[in-house]
């Protein structure tokens, strides 16, 4: 039984639901806070995620970062050497989706020379009547960037665990591949 630790960067524009997603995941869906204050720096959420069919687990250290450019210099230091990325946008806000490429580029610049596993999460699907980003468009963009794609409604507690379970599985797979490389060298 192996317990791995992974630094997970939670990135995206302000008010897309990053903090709500992290908090609801940490509490296993037990607590949805109706109002949030703007994250002005970085919040840290830690949760252990079992990897199915292995007996192993990944402890995700989820760095919930401010979505404002104002804090970007601070983010550079806090984002150093991430292991996985959770990129969040609001399905009712096309600009938040369009800005995902900027957030992805920023995260990847903090992990030069390595493959950074990640997911794209469209949040606020409960606001279907106000949807501005087509699911197929988001999925195609994510695929083109090497990201898995999910949609969720944190408010309705729908599919909020899947992105993090996927990240844990991706990180565990990288670990297994490295173990195999070392075994081949022995």
Swiss-Prot record:
One of its GO terms (cellular component) is nucleus. The keyword Nucleotide-binding applies. Pfam families: Ras. Its main location: other. SUPFAM superfamilies: P-loop containing nucleoside triphosphate hydrolases (SSF52540). It comes from the Eukaryota. Gene3D superfamilies: P-loop containing nucleotide triphosphate hydrolases. SMART domains: RAB, RAS, RHO. Component of the IFT complex B, at least composed of IFT20, IFT25, IFT27, IFT52, IFT57, IFT74, IFT81, IFT88 and TRAF3IP1. Interacts with IFT25. Interacts with IFT70B. Interacts with RABL2/RABL2A; binding is equal in the presence of GTP or GDP. Interacts with ARL6; recognizes and binds with the GTP-free form of ARL6. This is Intraflagellar transport protein 27 homolog.
